[in-house]
Curated annotation (Swiss-Prot):
CDD domains: 7tmA_CCR8. Residues 1-33, 92-105, 170-200, 262-278 are extracellular. Residues 62-71, 128-144, 221-236, 303-353 are cytoplasmic. Belongs to the G-protein coupled receptor 1 family. GO terms for cellular component: plasma membrane. Keywords: Cell membrane, Disulfide bond, G-protein coupled receptor, Glycoprotein, Membrane, Receptor, Transducer, Transmembrane, Transmembrane helix. Expressed in thymus. Its main location: membrane. InterPro entries: CCR1-9-like (IPR050119), Chemokine_CCR8 (IPR004068), Chemokine_rcpt (IPR000355), GPCR_Rhodpsn (IPR000276), GPCR_Rhodpsn_7TM (IPR017452). Pfam families: 7tm_1 (PF00001). This is C-C chemokine receptor type 8. It is found in: Cell membrane. Receptor for the CCL1/SCY1/TCA-3 chemokine. It comes from Mus musculus (Mouse).
Length: 353
């Protein structure tokens, strides 16, 4: 197909509205709002079900009382907070904001508390793995439920503290005749905008991944000389943790960092602004997906957790049959008893994430 223009005809003649109007970074996204909303709904349902199921199993099974289980429970709770903000963001995509300024700040708070606490708990779990494998003797003293609870409370406090500067700038304002909930910075507040962007980059990526890298390099060095089945599974899972976290969070942080460079006029131009706006939305959707994948990575892969999940499922089925006045099939009952016995034998083993 020939895209050559006629002589003496400019791009403005072909696209007068685009070149005469101010640079609009959002126009590229308006046609995709409905698709984004559908995707957000799918992520909400999957994230709500997955993380709720993790919490149900961890709270419902009395055998899950290790420090790892405490971190898993808090990680699922942080992802659930993140998930609860999605319906409001979906509504904000399709229609104007009708929930008021206070709710605008609350929803943004849920989003960022979920974001920061999730990254912090991933980091804390990595440090816990590092202690358990590299410093096994010392870990016996510190890897207790009370220490895990205290550290979890500290993580939540740190996440709330990191969120407060971001919440301050969220407000409801009119955009194209519609009320929207978004971060609003006056021109003299550019330094605050850059501060919040760099805060997300530093606390949401650079610091956690520096700790992750150190922990997992030391873990792999420690495990290199003893590759039995459990050790091999631990190495694979460690690599999965690092790679998946990078895949989901690095793109968004890079796009946010480049946006900061554009605000500093290091990067400039209308086309650059439009590409960055599109990149922020696309990478944000990718990062949203992480709240659905976490239950798979940190829970469903674990053999111990899968056994307890099956126990919960079988017990639920037995209660349903009992409520209906029927008995469970003999084969299912035998499988349940066998599963309980295997679970009791394996409960003394330390669970590998």
């Amino acid at each position: 197909m020939d895209y050559t223009m006629e002589p003496n005809v400019t791009m403005t003649d072909y696209y007068p509205d685009f070149f005469t109007a101010p640079c609009d970074a959002e126009f590229l996204l308006r046609g995709s709002m409905l698709y984004l909303a559908i995707l957000y709904c799918v992520l909400f349902v999957l994230g709500l079900l997955g993380n709720s199921l993790v919490i149900l199993v961890l709270v419902g099974c009395k055998k899950l009382r290790s420090i790892t289980d405490i971190y898993l429970l808090n990680l699922a709770a942080s992802d659930l907070l993140f998930v609860l903000s999605i319906p409001f963001q979906t509504h904000n995509l399709l229609d104007q904001w009708v929930f008021g300024t206070a709710m605008c700040k609350v929803v943004s708070g849920l989003y960022y508390i979920g974001f920061f606490s999730s990254m912090f708990f991933i980091t804390l779990m990595s440090v816990d793995r590092y202690l358990a494998i590299v410093h096994a003797v010392y870990a016996i003293k510190v890897r207790t439920a009370s220490v895990g609870t205290a550290l979890s409370l500290t993580v939540w406090l740190a996440a709330v503290t990191a969120t407060i500067p971001l919440m301050v700038f969220y407000q409801v304002a009119s955009e194209d005749g519609m009320l929207q909930c978004f971060q609003f910075y006056e021109e003299q507040s550019l330094r605050w905008k850059l501060f919040t962007h760099f805060e997300i980059n530093a606390l949401g990526l650079l610091l956690p991944f520096a700790i992750l890298l150190f922990c997992y390099v030391r873990i792999l060095q420690q495990l290199r000389g003893c590759l039995n089945h459990n050790r091999t599974r631990a190495i694979k899972l460690v690599l999965t943790v690092v790679i998946v976290s990078l895949l989901f969070w690095v793109p968004f942080n890079v796009a946010l960092f480049l946006t900061s460079l554009h605000d500093l006029h290091i990067l400039d131009g209308c086309a650059t602004r439009q590409r960055l706006a599109l990149a922020i939305h696309v990478t944000e959707v990718i990062s949203f997906t992480h709240c659905c994948v976490n239950p798979v990575i940190y829970a469903f892969i674990g053999e111990k957790f899968k056994k307890h999940l099956m126990d919960v499922f079988q017990k639920s089925c037995s209660h349903i049959f009992l409520y209906l006045g029927r008995q469970m099939p003999v084969g299912a009952l035998e499988r349940q008893l066998s599963s309980n016995q295997r679970s009791s034998h394996s409960s003394t083993l330390d669970d590998i994430l």
